[in-house]
Amino acid sequence: MKKIDFEVAGKRYEYNVPESWEELNADQFRAYVEVGAVNVDLARRIVAMDDVVAVSLTLSDWWWLTKEFDWMNDIENIGKLFMEELTMPDGTVYYGYNADFSDVTWEEWTFADSYASLGRWDIMTAVLYRQERPDWNRETDRRIPFTKYGTEARMEQTSKLDELTIRCVALNYKMLRKRLTDHYGHIFYEPIEEEETSKTGKKPQKKPRTDWLKLIRNMMGDNFYEEQKYLNLSVPSVLFQLESRVKEAQHGK
């Protein structure tokens, strides 16, 4: 954190402002998401201080403050889960996953990422955000185990979350997923639109996302009976194995 001070309408203000994405708290992240898509500079000011003071700044103060937040231009390699917990409409608290997905099983991931690719963030939230397990001892996953039936029950609440909360959950997930795609570049491919060719005149086509189930089954080969074992492994463990297999296959050509 960095301390800044300035004067507005004859009154002196002091604020401790974040110097990186990792220093933002959940409320500041929500403020950024709420206005960032429309006015990034305003988002920076509101992240730094309360919005009443922020909108009262002079043009020179505005310029000076936005320079303090140039780090916000870099949304690459962000490794923090800002939305650590969510309060549902019925008052129940759902807890999120580790920023590195180390407490997310491969089965959870295949469900969550598939729904994320379809823009069904309410379902993705119901997969990754869950109630606290009664026997939690701070040494295990805080959340109750993932099940498809539990997800359906949680959807009754996640489908009622306000739009801003869903946008925050979605952006945070995309940020953390980007770290995985950068680290495991051999196995991730995204639905990027192909350029329209002048020869065919065809409309751009979207490439499909990585088919996780197909990748796993290719890796298992004849050992299909081990599928459940892989589904129970953590996301980093499976991605590491997949990446290694792909590299070996490429080098063997």
Language-model segment annotations:
Residues 1-253:
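An amphipathic, hydrophobic-aromatic interaction surface with interspersed Lys/Arg
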